[in-house]
From Swiss-Prot:
Source species of the chain: Lawsonia intracellularis (strain PHE/MN1-00)
PROSITE patterns: PCMT (PS01279)
Name under which the protein is recorded: Protein-L-isoaspartate O-methyltransferase
Keyword Cytoplasm set for record: yes
Gene name, Swiss-Prot/TrEMBL: pcm
Single GO term (MF): protein-L-isoaspartate (D-aspartate) O-methyltransferase activity
Subcellular location field: Cytoplasm
Family statement: Belongs to the methyltransferase superfamily. L-isoaspartyl/D-aspartyl protein methyltransferase family.
Amino acid sequence: MLRYHTSKNNFPLASDLRRQRERMVITQLEQRGITNSYVLTAMRNVHRHLFVPEALQSRAYDDYPLPIGYGQTISRPYIVAIMTSLLEPTPGLSVLEIGTGSGYQTAILANIGLEVFSLERVRELYFQTKELFFLLGYRKIRTCLSDGTLGWEEHAPFDRIIVTAGGPNIPLPLLNQLGDPGVMVIPVGQNPREQELMCITKKNNTVTSTVIGNVAFVDLVGDYGW
């Protein structure tokens, strides 16, 4: 059963939430160097509080991750913004998301105008977000309940791939399903609770990687993960 409320009249007041959302964009994103207009606009448009449990809605725009159940979290706003910016998103590009989770990152990608494919392994989250996307009008997002480390061969290649969980290595199926040219953003690390955020680019059959910084994500579970 869906644990999230989509009514704009729920507590906190809609006007308060709008102010919180604008403050989030200014203080957490713009003042920290996020400049991509697609990302900033999407994070102003998407109501983050609708993607967290009702009891946490008043904290939805704070600068830290929040639990969403089943051992999963919604990433802090800055991490969502930096990962999305690294994708160099342009409307019309296809993107594969590994780990639908709360659905917030998925909605940001869809709001930008990307063609979104999203995989989730936690059954309860898969059905919750599927219903939530329908209620919020995100009818073009395609989701699947499956092992995200295997990718989604049926719809490959993808212009972009974003992985929202950390594994010990870059899953080979994802690298194979990344288009050329293409960009993948993924946390990688041998420590299950500490990874390096990496930006992988593929161009002219050459793959290059850049370490962006240290991050901490939940485990990437699957055949090519933990």
